Amino acid sequence: MIPTKRAHRLVAVLAVPALLLTAACGNGDSGNGDSGDGDGATASWPVATVTGDMGEEPEVTVEEDAERAEETRVDVLVQGDGPEVSDGDFLRTGLLVRSPDAEQEDLVNTWRPMVADPEGGEEQEDSGPVYAALRVNVDDLLPPAATEPLIGVNEGSRVVVQGSAVELIGDIATQLGFEEGDSVVFVYDVVTVIDAQGRVEGEQAPVEEGMPEVEAEGTEPAEITIPEGEDPPQELRSQVLIEGDGPEVEAGTQLIAQYTGAAWSDGEVFDSSWSRDAAAKFGIGVGQVIQGWDEVLVGSNVGDRVLLVIPPDKGYGASEGHDLQEETLVFVVDILDAV
C-alpha cells in the first residue's frame, strides 16, 4: 500500500514536467548479483533482499544493519524469454519502489493500488494489482537513471534495481525527503515490451464511402487523402481499418498509440507521433485528449487501427484562438497498448 505523505509526494512530483525529472548523476554500474531463470529467485545486496514469484507482490526485507548502496546494483531474479527491452521502449510493468531508509514504506506499489473513496474520505486500498506504463531511459513516469538498467532485459523478467536515491531519482530525491547516502529499491515485473516506433499489424480494410483514404507503413506519418469534392461530415465518424485482438480499451487507462492528424480542408498533416520518433502516451476517457478521441477510442481494442473524422465541436472548437478551432480533423490512430 502507499500509506504515507511521502508516497503521495512521489506520485505528485513524478507528475511534474520532464525537466524536473532529469537524474542528477549518470548511469550506475550494474552488479553481477544473483540471477534466476525461474520463479522465486532471490536478490540481496547490500540493502534489500527481494523474494517472490513473477506476477505476485514481491517481498522486500531490509536488515537494520544493512549497508547503504554506493553503486547501482541490478539483479534479474526471473529471466524472461520475450523480446529484449531497447532504449526508448514503452513497458507494461508491475512496479514497487521502496525507501529502505524510511521504515521500509512503499513509495509506489502497483500490487496494492489506491483508489479514491467515493464518499470523499481517505483513499482506500483497491482489490487487485494494476500495471505501470513507463518509457525506458526517457523522462517519463520515472527518471531515466531508474529505467536505463532495464535495457537488454527480456520481457517476462523480474528485475531489482537498487542504489543511491539521489543517483536513481535525481534532484527531486531531496523533495521526497531523501538525504545524501540514502538508498532506494525498484522491483520491476516486465510484462510487455512495446516498441516505441511500432505499428499495428494486419490487413487494412477499404475505407467506407465518404471517408478519407489512408496509406500507413514504415516509420513515416500516414498519408491521408481527403475525398475530392466532399464536404466534411457534421457528425463524428470512425472506422476500424485493422482489427486488433488485444483487450478492450477502458476509460482511465494510459493509451500508447501512434497517430497522424490532418485537416479536412486541405489534407495537410498538422501533427504526428512519427515526427517525434516515438508513440504517444496519454490518459483516455478522462478529458486529457479531444472529445472525439475519448468517445471513439474507449471501447476499441489494442491492436486496432482507427480512422476518425472529428467535427469542430468534438475537436478544438472549444479552444478559443486555436488554429484548428473551426477545422474538421482527420486522425489515423494505431493502438499499441492500453495500461
What is the predicted function of each stretch?
Residues 2-339:
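Cross-family detector of peptidyl-prolyl cis-trans isomerase
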